[in-house]
């Protein structure tokens, strides 16, 4: 992606941030590009992430990449630029590495956005390129143990936290208070061509891309997170649910369904209604694949209902392989699964496809997770 014209460039080193209690720019707009840096400059509490993920056509292989600018992860390494690389293979083994880059550069231009996390001393660089309309993304891996490219081409439209298609003046990027989220690529076609420790991994399937940014640490803002991304037949379905830690008990969800690239359903309502569109989402149990955490979820069921338009969609997701798992104590943590999906409009054609799910629960008491809320 040639970046030939004037660009906004954010070039930071690993420990570069403002000192003390100083207000920094924190963008919450649902109009501007989701890819531009949202926090400028960094301070000691706020952080942001560019996330990319994908699942193979058979539902057995997956990847998740996280590009972070977040001082809250400094407790786990050195500096503010955490970068995580995760792959799950069909034989149920996994590859996982974390890097702490010395430098992060994000160039935001009219043709698109390019980010690079690099450490010349340790000999690695990881980068991404995203078109201005957020229809395509490329990720480039270059380290001693992971090399190659991942290409994602969207089959939907970028959406805000409340499910509106970008750009939208009446939309919100707030998942829960102080925690913001958007989905530049709800789902699309992915092509993976990488070498992991000299072993080739090549597959096609479904990919997606998320953006997260928060004024405080995830633990400060959240107690729970759940997500489903699936692509089947003409449909792309995305679901996210967040439970606030700052406003105890407050849960917000967002469900959007695309058909042939266009939105056909959106709702933030989690209770049944005779008038308003709503989505009932529940975990399912008793399947073959689960993780080691206390919650032995093996899939999801999603009921999307529009009383006014006489529409009712039902989708099922069943886990096929564990993509990643973080044990955070007290039997809880974060886990992600690749899997299979089926569903469609009730009484009409039904389809089969692939899915990625994620669930996160923070422990109630841990010395590693303390609130950094500042009034």
UniProtKB/Swiss-Prot annotation:
InterPro entries: DA_C
Position of the signal peptide: none
Amino-acid biosynthesis found in the keyword field: no
Keyword Glycosyltransferase: no
Pathway: Mycotoxin biosynthesis
Keywords linked to the UniProt accession: Isomerase
One term of GO molecular function: isomerase activity
EC numbers, comma separated: 5.5.1.-
Pfam families: DA_C, DA_N
Role this protein plays: Diels-Alderase; part of the gene cluster that mediates the biosynthesis of a family of the mycotoxins cytochalasins E and K. The hybrid PKS-NRPS synthetase ccsA and the enoyl reductase ccsC are responsible for fusion of phenylalanine with an octaketide backbone and subsequent release of the stable tetramic acid precursor. The polyketide synthase module (PKS) of the PKS-NRPS ccsA is responsible for the synthesis of the octaketide backbone. The downstream nonribosomal peptide synthetase (NRPS) amidates the carboxyl end of the octaketide with a phenylalanine.
Similarity comment: Belongs to the Diels-Alderase family.
Record's protein name: Diels-Alderase ccsF
Organism: Aspergillus clavatus (strain ATCC 1007 / CBS 513.65 / DSM 816 / NCTC 3887 / NRRL 1 / QM 1276 / 107)
